[in-house]
Amino acid sequence: MKFIKNNIYIEIDTNPLTFYTELGIIIRALFILNKDFTVIKIKIKIRNIRMKVVILAGGLGTRFSEESEFKPKPMIEIGEMPILWHIMKEYSYYGFNEFIICAGYKQHVIKEWFADYFLHTSDITFDFTQGNKVIIHNQHAEPWKVTVVDTGLHTMTGGRIKRIQSYVGDEPFLMTYGDGVCDVNIEKLVEFHREHRKIATLTSVLLEQDKGVLNIEEDNSVRSFREKNLKDGMPINAGYMVLEPEVFSYIKDDTTVFEKEPMERLAKEGQLMSYSHKGFWQCMDTKREKDILENLLKQGKAPWKKW
């Protein structure tokens, strides 16, 4: 059962009563009842949070052999900044500023880049006449909290998600891949997810790519999910997901590919929704696709760049 009043979403489940507000305040009220359903006790828990954003960034990027020899694919630059940064700026535009990066291959590159973030975005004076003094000018700060987690070199996508469970906790979270940008309205995506009250919602697009094929019903529920078998004009998985914490129970271990058994099972059980996006989406699996993104950025026509 769901009510919407004064921009507050009230959802009644078999567990706690949950209130969502547009500011990210979550109120959970657990009602303890008598056998006649009279209320004995009410336990209320209030959290003022925004959903955390999980970004998968541990892949090898084998199609970028020249660049990926020295860095993970999410650190390959579009313009002068890594594609990972572009993705984070997208989420930050909508007010989602706490990130969990699932690192793996050359994870130290990601950690070092964030450790030196001010060096990348500010003017620096190195004064060697006064004890190696470093002065940072016009510091450009982001409203971000970033946790980089080493989720293993050969861990599959599901395993990487499972490994960051302790950082997510028992709250819903956002998740996407570290090699694709999109101009999806993330606020509307989250609202869609809350309205349908399923465990998982993914963003789907129509594109001729080698990605997962979705069988989507008229009510936007996903009835089947097949990976790597696309025919022209069929909806595909673009990432940009909203996930409930129950999703962790669908992941067995490090060998679990999230796009295989977990998503197939979610679809079979009616727990996977599709948010249809008609706008821009582009992954970066090849040098040609990187060039597409580079050219859009140079021309000032990058649809994902809203900031």
Question: Where are these predicted regions, by residue range?
Answer:
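Short, positively charged and aromatic/hydrophobic N-terminal segments
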Residues: Y9, T18-Y20, I25, I32, ...
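N-terminal glycine-rich phosphate-binding loop and ensuing alpha1 helix
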Residues: R47-Y117, V148
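Structural beta-sheet core signal
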Residues: V53-I55, I101, M175, A200-T203, ...
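A structural signal for short hydrophobic beta-strand segments in well-ordered beta-sheet cores
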Residues: M75, V213-I216, M263, S274
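Catalytic-core segments of class I nucleotidyltransferases/pyrophosphorylases
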Residues: P172-L174, V181, N185-R194, L206-Q209, ...
